[in-house]
Amino acid sequence: MLRLLEEKIATPLGPLWVICDEQFRLRAVEWEEYSERMVQLLDIHYRKEGYERISATNPGGLSDKLREYFAGNLSIIDTLPTATGGTPFQREVWKTLRTIPCGQVMHYGQLAEQLGRPGAARAVGAANGSNPISIVVPCHRVIGRNGTMTGYAGGVQRKEWLLRHEGYLLL
């Protein structure tokens, strides 16, 4: 059975769940008010093998590292280990999201092209929307083709804040 260590931390944008495995690889990072969605994703990815959630304090130092990100040490999120469920395509999208540098954005079509799947922007968008590791797998760095702040599971206001925090100038 998979044991997931969890802690809820305070951030400038509200409480954030940090969930990792016993090897301290992030499995989920989600805003508190979307915890039902997080549980649904955990069930989808790990119900078959079974999992239990265990309260922990700063598991593997991950909570402190996320606090550092919010305090301005932006590059720290690039160092955080992750382990995700999902389909092979979803994992490919999520891995590619981590290559978008802090302070930069990409639109869904560009991300699809980078994956070698031109024309798959909608599929990329769907995979982006089911990302269980918010912020660390930076789905907030993907915007609409015309520069619009398209959907972000944590809310568009958070997306805008995160992009400003990372130095992306919003017009």
UniProtKB/Swiss-Prot annotation:
Principal cellular location given in the protein's record: cytoplasm
Cross-referenced InterPro entries: MethylDNA_cys_MeTrfase_AS, MethylDNA_cys_MeTrfase_DNA-bd, MethylDNA_cys_MeTrfase_DNAb, MethylG_MeTrfase_N, MGMT, MGMT_N_sf, WH-like_DNA-bd_sf
CDD domains: ATase (cd06445)
GO MF entries: methylated-DNA-[protein]-cysteine S-methyltransferase activity
Additional remark text: This enzyme catalyzes only one turnover and therefore is not strictly catalytic. According to one definition, an enzyme is a biocatalyst that acts repeatedly and over many reaction cycles.
Catalysed reactions listed for this entry: a 6-O-methyl-2'-deoxyguanosine in DNA + L-cysteinyl-[protein] = S-methyl-L-cysteinyl-[protein] + a 2'-deoxyguanosine in DNA; a 4-O-methyl-thymidine in DNA + L-cysteinyl-[protein] = a thymidine in DNA + S-methyl-L-cysteinyl-[protein]
Superkingdom: Bacteria
Subcellular location(s) of the protein: Cytoplasm
Protein's recorded name: Methylated-DNA--protein-cysteine methyltransferase
Active site: 139 (nucleophile)
Purpose: Involved in the cellular defense against the biological effects of O6-methylguanine (O6-MeG) and O4-methylthymine (O4-MeT) in DNA. Repairs the methylated nucleobase in DNA by stoichiometrically transferring the methyl group to a cysteine residue in the enzyme. This is a suicide reaction: the enzyme is irreversibly inactivated.
